[in-house]
């Protein structure tokens, strides 16, 4: 089977990896019943990742003739006698309009139909979303016969949702277990204090016999055995108190002393830290040259971007700066959108790798949303009008998750900045997100 490059502009590239079979046609019938059969239409359509009915219908629309594709037999017929070269030329136009990305030219696109019945091509190679000219005749046929939706993305998000629920249940179970252990430790520490107090009293009295020393601990053992009958699951406290040797009692005294001294050290060190924080706040966060103000951080991020830093390299450099996490994220957003006056959605798509690296840690999605809010709410910022598009782009790129977006939106409506226009501009995307969530739950 002879192969050719997909797209007329790539016909001379010997190393082009996107290929399709050369078209083979056959004239059938006579007189008024003459038809042109595109023999290998199914193979061509598979390489283009488009239904064969689309290409067949396109031939009919452009030639002004009836066309039919039989799904059962896989045959493609166009009424009339047509040369192979003519049909191949029409196929190239179809590829340019409905297959190739308008941005990078690669044929790795997927047809999307929006709620407004508009057709878009989403490129898997560069992420660019191309708007198809809806004046073409074939667009009506595509809207009425949409391609089969891949359930991969929905299944992926459903799996993520299930995984989050599982993690939440696990965290709740861990919290309950920690509470139980704390209660056991409190009981153990109180009984241990009683035991150590009695042992010190016995030492002062000079009772040197081992039996006198061990007599109070026997009573503790009996109390612990009764507690064990009530709760068989908590074994740690019982084992800790059953050891009544001299070394064990000394170890318990050391642990109690170390805990008390640790509290004393923490109390003494807290005050200087508070003073340092207060002084740094008064000086604008630039005390002794160990921390930097916000403007300096933004300038450094911009300089690193100009140097060609990658996402991981830039984020590792940013993480080392002695500034709060929210300021780092705000500086990153401001630097990435520098010089952008329009097309914030496209710019977000281009810089998605940086945003994805920035939200790698838990809780960082909320920081990114606050940074976007801060950037959009600046005076004379055109990004405020496109905030919904920015959120949609980050959501489609799996940078932001629906839970974080909805949580940020709901808190914003009740916060100090509730009168900002950002919430009104973001509302269409939030409504779409919640409707899509309810539809997926119903399915």
Swiss-Prot record:
CDD domains on file: W2_eIF5
UniProt biased composition (Acidic residues): 228-237
Single GO term (MF): GDP-dissociation inhibitor activity
Any one Gene Ontology cellular component term annotated for this protein: cytosol
Protein name: Eukaryotic translation initiation factor 5
Biased composition (Low complexity): 280-291
GO biological process entries: formation of cytoplasmic translation initiation complex
Residue span, W2 domain: 284-443
Key words of the record: GTP-binding, Initiation factor, Nucleotide-binding, Protein biosynthesis
InterPro entries tied to this protein: ARM-type_fold (IPR016024), IF2/IF5 (IPR045196), Transl_init_fac_IF2/IF5_dom (IPR002735), Transl_init_fac_IF2/IF5_N (IPR016189), Transl_init_fac_IF2/IF5_Zn-bd (IPR016190), W2_domain (IPR003307)
Functional description taken from the UniProt entry: Catalyzes the hydrolysis of GTP bound to the 40S ribosomal initiation complex (40S.mRNA.Met-tRNA[F].eIF-2.GTP) with the subsequent joining of a 60S ribosomal subunit resulting in the release of eIF-2 and the guanine nucleotide. The subsequent joining of a 60S ribosomal subunit results in the formation of a functional 80S initiation complex (80S.mRNA.Met-tRNA[F]).
Biased composition (Basic residues): 179-188
Binding of GTP, residues: 29-36
Gene3D superfamilies listed in its UniProt record: 1.25.40.180, 2.20.25.350, 3.30.30.170
